[in-house]
Swiss-Prot record:
It comes from the Viruses. InterPro entries: DNA_clamp_sf, Pr_cel_nuc_antig, Pr_cel_nuc_antig_C, Pr_cel_nuc_antig_CS, Pr_cel_nuc_antig_N. PROSITE patterns: PCNA_1 (PS01251), PCNA_2 (PS00293). Keywords: DNA replication, DNA-binding. GO terms for molecular function: DNA binding; DNA polymerase processivity factor activity. HAMAP family: DNApol_clamp_arch (MF_00317). Sliding clamp subunit. Responsible for tethering the catalytic subunit of DNA polymerase to DNA during high-speed replication. This is Probable DNA polymerase sliding clamp 1. It comes from Paramecium bursaria Chlorella virus 1 (PBCV-1). The keyword DNA-binding applies. GO terms for biological process: leading strand elongation; mismatch repair; regulation of DNA replication; translesion synthesis. Pfam families: PCNA_C, PCNA_N.
């Protein structure tokens, strides 16, 4: 095909990571604007209820092939994208192409070089009104780095008891608590972490912290643990909570959610 007809050509060998990414995103986003540009792929979108913000940046240098001279904003349905990616295996590459003579489609190719197999899809694009929202640079009071699957287990176990997770920081100790203000909960839970293999806590000041968050959203965010060994948790009083996951070795995925005001 004439190279002049190819507006971008992007291939990664981390097909399983891309599949895991959209498996996670489909729990939070419905329709989303994918921004393909010279420096990488971006998403900046609010969920349908406008409760949480999703911010994704995949760096162009992390792809095996990346040819995209201009920026293209393409609207896709996240669930439909995952349905196409679902067949990708751990040894499959994924190729995204956008063609000048077919501007209402994005071309997606899943290829296994060992098996000499190839599956090609053409997915319809959709019209979306989207405004990009940046995550500003803020100096957070406390940063927690812990195994992503451990934080996922805390949230999953806590959701069997309560609807909300209360994060408390006092001194150099951080605890994850069930909502002790809810009289309908049949039990309470408190998990305390300090500096260890299960968590590293960086305190930029001595400010104590306590905020409450929706476990419905946190458990959805935790699906990102399938592609990230660790999660970074950013805390600052009267500010939204930020969870940061790596996307394989390709970039970072951030979730931003405001605290629940009592």
């Amino acid at each position: 095909m004439d190279d002049d007809n190819v507006l971008f050509h992007i291939r990664t060998l981390q097909g399983n990571v891309i599949k895991s990414l959209f498996d996670c995103l489909k729990e939070i986003l419905h329709d989303v604007m994918l921004s393909f540009g010279p420096t990488g792929i971006r998403i900046s979108a609010l969920d349908g209820a406008k409760v949480s913000l999703v911010h994704l940046k995949l760096d162009s240098e992390s792809f095996e092939e990346y040819k995209c001279e201009h920026t293209y904003e393409l609207g896709v349905n996240v669930l439909n994208m995952f349905k196409l990616l679902r067949s990708a295996g751990s040894h499959d590459s994924i190729l995204f192409r956008y063609l000048k003579n077919d501007p209402h489609m994005i071309e997606l190719t899943i290829q296994n070089f060992e098996k000499n197999s190839l599956t090609k899809f053409n997915m319809k694009l959709i019209e979306i009104d989207s405004v990009e929202i940046e995550v500003g640079d803020i100096e957070f009071d406390t940063i927690i780095v812990m195994p992503a699957n451990y934080f996922q287990r805390i949230c999953r176990d806590m959701s069997d008891i309560t609807d909300h997770l209360v994060i408390v920081k006092k001194g150099d100790e951080v605890s994850f608590n069930s909502d002790y203000t809810c009289v309908t909960d049949f039990a309470s839970q408190k998990t305390i972490i300090g500096d260890s293999d299960n968590g590293q806590i960086t305190c930029n000041n001595d400010t104590d912290y306590e905020s409450k968050f929706s476990l419905k959203y946190l458990t959805s965010f935790c699906k990102a643990s399938g592609m990230s060994s660790a999660v970074e948790i950013y805390l600052k009083e009267s500010y939204p909570l930020i969870l940061k996951y790596t996307v394989g070795s390709m970039g970072a995925l951030k979730f931003v959610i405001a605290p629940i005001l009592s």
